[in-house]
């Protein structure tokens, strides 16, 4: 396991053993609070910088990074998460990045969603990524 960056994780939602494991494996973790402090553009740039000279990057858009108010259909979302706008901006910037070889969207349970809020947010993330891809 090398060159892993996690962006937007919840500060209180991760167990201490998970945090220790991430540190031991040199996983670069940026909390949602840190994203808000430095802005999503700077955060994405920093995460890509951490990945260094990796020729190809895979991006997992985990809907759990969103604040619970915006993602009732994401099983582990909670208060204090990212906004859909922040995640869409990240998706657009990552779509522009030539090293990104593929993406997926995870942690989405439509059966637990309310008024398709989370599903619509996931679709907006995908569309934002594709808009970035088209601008390459």
Language-model features: where?
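Flexible, glycine/proline-enriched loop segments at strand-loop-helix junctions
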Residues: 5-10, 31-35
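Glycine-rich beta-alpha junction loops
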Residues: 10-13, 63-65
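Short, glycine/polar-rich helix-capping loops at beta-to-alpha or helix-loop-helix junctions
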Residues: 12-24
């Amino acid at each position: 396991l090398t060159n892993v960056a996690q962006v937007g994780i919840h500060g209180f939602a991760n167990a201490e053993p998970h945090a220790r494991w991430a540190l031991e494996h040199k996983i670069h973790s940026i909390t949602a609070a840190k994203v808000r402090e430095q802005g999503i553009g700077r955060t994405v740039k920093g995460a890509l910088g951490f990945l260094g000279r990796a020729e190809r990057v895979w991006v997992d858009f985990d809907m759990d990074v969103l604040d619970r108010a915006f993602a009732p259909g994401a099983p582990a979302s909670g208060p204090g998460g990212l906004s859909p706008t922040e995640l869409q901006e990240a998706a657009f910037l990552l779509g522009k990045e030539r090293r990104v070889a593929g993406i997926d969207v995870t942690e989405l349970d439509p059966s637990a969603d309310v008024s398709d809020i989370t599903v619509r947010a996931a679709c907006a993330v995908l569309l934002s990524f594709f808009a970035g891809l088209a601008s390459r």
